[in-house]
């Protein structure tokens, strides 16, 4: 008879450990599908693995679903990622991340759809305000400590929008402007901030 696990019992267990396969086998096919396909802004509770419901909120400069008034909670709008990167100070990024994490705890938010780690490829980029810099190393350093601060307070960061995503019009329909770049450029520049956010900051998710 297979051992039954709760998701809390596997906290900190290596991703490659076979116990994860045993945990997943406790889900029905519908539960497994729903966990992926119905995961916008949170995930449902699953009793068979004692998984609680989670709540995620959007906004690289704070939880904007509160700022824009979709509920009655109050929230802080922090300086944009670009402004934070212009300080060239990883500790400021870390402090902002901590503040976002503390606020997330107060609002009972588990995950943060941010920060944004794409590069400023063009001054006309539709989401430049969400991203740090045109330099991959600077963006990666600031992003990593932004993420680390939030994570240390218990809020998981979902870094976005991977990768080379700087055209807003038609971006989800496949009708936007195409980008041309070499694999070397993609790896050394555009993916560098995401790599650093994971390796240095401990980011748990990508968008």
Q: Each predicted region: which residue ranges?
A:
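Glycoside hydrolase catalytic-domain context in secreted enzymes
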Residues: 1-207
């Amino acid at each position: 008879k297979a051992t039954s696990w709760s998701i809390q019992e596997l906290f900190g267990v290596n991703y490659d450990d076979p116990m994860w396969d045993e945990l997943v086998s406790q889900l029905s096919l519908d539960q497994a599908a729903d966990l992926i396909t119905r995961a916008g802004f949170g995930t449902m509770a699953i009793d068979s693995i004692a998984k609680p419901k989670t709540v995620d909120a959007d906004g690289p400069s704070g939880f904007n679903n509160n700022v824009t008034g979709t509920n009655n909670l109050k929230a802080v709008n922090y300086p944009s990622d670009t402004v934070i990167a212009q300080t060239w100070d990883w500790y400021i990024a870390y402090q902002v991340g901590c503040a976002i994490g503390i606020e997330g705890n107060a609002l009972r938010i588990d995950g943060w759809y941010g920060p944004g780690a794409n590069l400023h490829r063009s001054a006309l980029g539709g989401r430049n305000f969400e991203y740090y810099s045109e330099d991959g190393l600077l963006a990666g350093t600031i992003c990593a400590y932004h993420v680390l601060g939030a994570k240390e307070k218990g809020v998981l960061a979902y870094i976005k929008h991977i990768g080379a995503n700087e055209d807003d019009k038609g971006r989800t329909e496949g009708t936007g402007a195409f980008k041309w770049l070499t694999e070397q450029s993609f790896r050394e520049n555009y993916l560098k901030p995401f790599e650093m956010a994971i390796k240095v900051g401990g980011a748990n998710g990508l968008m």
